[in-house]
Amino acid sequence: MPAIDLARLKKQTARLADSFDQPSVFLRELREILEFYVNRTLRSQSVAPSSVLPTYRTPVVVLRQIEKELGSLAERQPVRALGLADALWDEGWLETKLIAAFLLGRIPPQEERLLARLTAWTQAVRDPEVRAALLTTSLTRLRRETPDLFLILVKEWLHPARQRMWSNGIQALMPLISSPDFDNLPPIFEIVEPILKTSPATLQYDLQELIIVLFEASPDETTFFLQEIIKGTRNPLPSVALRRMAPKLPQELQISLREILRQANTRTR
């Protein structure tokens, strides 16, 4: 791989941005850039790649410069941005899917096809890096500018009939809960309550992460919420799941849960 000349890279990506409204031309020029900066040393390593997608092993600085050139264009031209994102997604490489996910995050939430695209792509994704990008970067403007619409989308993902989407829904909530500007936890509790009452073993890690983030945001509200979950269901799975998670939870919450679970056990005798 040639050493990265930032001046040259800026010229290459500026030229690439000129083809923003011509997906076929854009893809051709993007391939040339990715091939130019391909890290063949990493490609030839015998270790298994972390991605399940074909990849150029593009240096992060190259992808960030491409995103920098495209971000404002996507904001000003959302329809064309969505068309380009579709073409990039269909191209099927790790890098093209990551750029597509980035573009979704710059498209105004009012674009009517955005929510459908987010749902379709998150349902189909298998690569962990692309999945993470879709659940964070792609939801940036929706989460920040229209939190009510964002929560409607996540509630759809957490519908009882869409269990394959539950993990995505939980992970999508994390950045919102962690945001210092967000302090409205009751709607979050309402959305995740049915999932916690079910507590499937396959979601233990996701639920553990969720509880930690909720507790960091509001210890008292989260402790009370978990207490009501335990008191309000005859299903033993929430109690079983919380006992398994307890060693990984904050110490203060562990102490509270121990007492909550002891009281629940006493009531069932």
Q: Across the structure, where does each feature detected by a protein language model lie?
A:
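Alpha-helical scaffold domains
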Residues: 1-269
